[in-house]
Amino acid sequence: MAGKELERCQRQADEVTEIMLNNFDKVLERDGKLAELEQRSDQLLDMSSAFSKTTKTLAQKKRWENARCRIYMGLAVGIALLILLIVLLVIFLPQSSKGSSAPQVQDAGPASGPGE
């Protein structure tokens, strides 16, 4: 009876030992996976930081390009308006000055002298 009881306790101890070894192996495997996940998360963090810097740099570059384009367009419109103003002044100013500077002769009808 004591031998059977001892055998049963030994089997239970062996089962518990086997379960503990399996659990220990699973913990080691899980630890390896966690380390890999941590490494991947660090890589993703680095990549997101680089992406953020690149995005900010690109946005700033595009803003400057857009501002430069607006400045060039404003200058082009300003120059076009200036040229149009000069052309209009050249066309209309000499005609109005010729008409006002030349003596105007008014026709008073048939010439009547003092003796008539």
From Swiss-Prot:
Keywords: Cell membrane, Coiled coil, Developmental protein, Differentiation, Golgi apparatus, Membrane, Myogenesis, Phosphoprotein, Transmembrane, Transmembrane helix. It is found in: Cell membrane; Endomembrane system; Golgi apparatus, trans-Golgi network membrane. Residues 97-116 are annotated as: Disordered. GO terms for biological process: cell differentiation; Golgi to plasma membrane protein transport; muscle organ development. Pfam families: Synaptobrevin. GO terms for cellular component: Golgi apparatus; plasma membrane. Residues 1-72 are cytoplasmic. InterPro entries: Synaptobrevin-like (IPR001388), V_SNARE_CC (IPR042855), Vamp5 (IPR042166), VAMP5_R-SNARE (IPR042581). The modification Phosphoserine is found at residues 41, 48-49. Residues 5-65 form the v-SNARE coiled-coil homology domain. Disulfide bonds: none annotated. The chain crosses the membrane at residues 73-93. Residues 94-116 are vesicular. It is a single-pass type IV membrane protein. Belongs to the synaptobrevin family. May participate in trafficking events that are associated with myogenesis, such as myoblast fusion and/or GLUT4 trafficking. This is Vesicle-associated membrane protein 5. It comes from Bos taurus (Bovine). The gene is VAMP5.
